[in-house]
Amino acid sequence: MLDMSEARAQPPCSPSGTASSMSHVEDSDSDAPPSPAGSEGLGRAGGGGRGDTAEAADERFPACIRDAVSQVLKGYDWSLVPMPVRGGGGGTLKAKPHVKRPMNAFMVWAQAARRKLADQYPHLHNAELSKTLGKLWRLLSESEKRPFVEEAERLRVQHKKDHPDYKYQPRRRKSVKTGRSDSDSGTELGHHPGGPMYKADAVLGEAHHHSDHHTGQTHGPPTPPTTPKTDLHQASNGSKQELRLEGRRLVDSGRQNIDFSNVDISELSSEVISNMDTFDVHEFDQYLPLNGHSALPTEPSQATASGSYGGASYSHSGATGIGASPVWAHKGAPSASASPTEAGPLRPQIKTEQLSPSHYNDQSHGSPGRADYGSYSAQASVTTAASATAASSFASAQCDYTDLQASNYYSPYPGYPPSLYQYPYFHSSRRPYASPLLNGLSMPPAHSPSSNWDQPVYTTLTRP
């Protein structure tokens, strides 16, 4: 442990030495002029010891490592690091630095003795040192304690002179917790993910991390290359923070399914959302081919405008007949209608596919706008015969599709003629038939004869 007699003999050395070195240790607290002899001697000893240990620590690493570290640290601006705000002020930065309490007699003794002992026994752990110093202090007699008591009194008077209106305000216990969460959220701000971020239930963490976003927010809105358009749209609404937190959760959890019932519809861009309110959540799964592109080639005459919504294909060939309707062409396959043969297992991909920026940038569509339905329903009479022949042609396949072609498409959309789309395959039992249905819906354009187009070849669909 520690030689008691030696430690006992050490403290009452010259009172000026230990005591004044004390006032020098906490020079942020008191402006008491240190007596040169004691404090500078001690300070020099301590400084020398510290410099030696720093050099020794440096020697542990090879020169190349040290050079690399200094090279990295040199280029980093440490003023950008968000500093966690400690203290119970609710995150408000205090203009003036914290004024510490004046040291009492034990602190005067402990700091001076700790400095001396740390130089003599560098292997001693600080906590063990403190325990030992406390025991020793209790064993000291009044006469031995007197120099420290006098120095503490002098520090107190000096402190009162320096800070006349000082009032001791002990910290509240909970400040430890807030400090920790501040620093944590500072690191979160530093590492916002590069993947797409969705705001599914981003109310999470808004209240919790509210205060620190004011202090730690030094970088701009997140614009990684894969950020979808909805993110930019929301960034203008000032909800960047929740996006970050939520995006981190979604990316970490391996792109879980988004529950569309939780999406705040008002925040998504209007063209995506114009008709989404009546869609079933599971309906999007029909339109998902595995690779997002075509699997079956079709005749050029029948798929002049193969519309893809998140990799889906509504082959709206009627678009050619009416100039007002936009041509939705998938960027890679203008003459191929996507066949979702593997539509079943692809549930996680729909989220990235449906909101991914490539579809936003390369096609001018969200879900079909209302004008489109008007234009396509105008073609309904022309194409009913064709779709009927399509239906009868694969009525002999694994299921009877004629009910899918019944004259009642898109009954969920009340304003449109009941002849275009209806989704009877909302239910999982009908889901595998989406591919032949969609390919059968590749209607011939208005100017081509409706009777002489070749039937595409269909593969048998199996649920994996």
Swiss-Prot record:
Motif 9aaTAD residues? 418-426
The annotated region (Transactivation domain (TAM)) lies at 221-299
Please list the residue ranges that the record marks as compositionally biased, kind Polar residues.
354-366, 448-464
| Key words of the record | DNA-binding, Nucleus, Transcription, Transcription regulation
Q: What is known of its domains?
A: The transactivation domains TAM and TAC (for transactivation domain in the middle and at the C-terminus, respectively) are required to contact transcriptional coactivators and basal transcriptional machinery components and thereby induce gene transactivation. The 9aaTAD motif is a transactivation domain present in a large number of yeast and animal transcription factors.
Q: What is this protein called?
A: Transcription factor SOX-8
Q: What CDD domains does the annotation carry?
A: HMG-box_SoxE
Q: Where does the record place the region Dimerization (DIM)?
A: 55-97
In which residue ranges is the amino acid composition biased (Low complexity)? 303-315
Q: Which InterPro entries match?
A: HMG_box_dom, HMG_box_dom_sf, Sox_N, SOX_TF
Please name the source species: Mus musculus (Mouse)
Q: Which residues form the signal peptide?
A: none
Q: Where in the cell is it found?
A: Nucleus
Task: Answer yes or no on keyword Phosphoprotein.
Answer: no
Query: PANTHER family attached here?
Result: SOX100B (PTHR45803), TRANSCRIPTION FACTOR SOX-8 (PTHR45803:SF2)
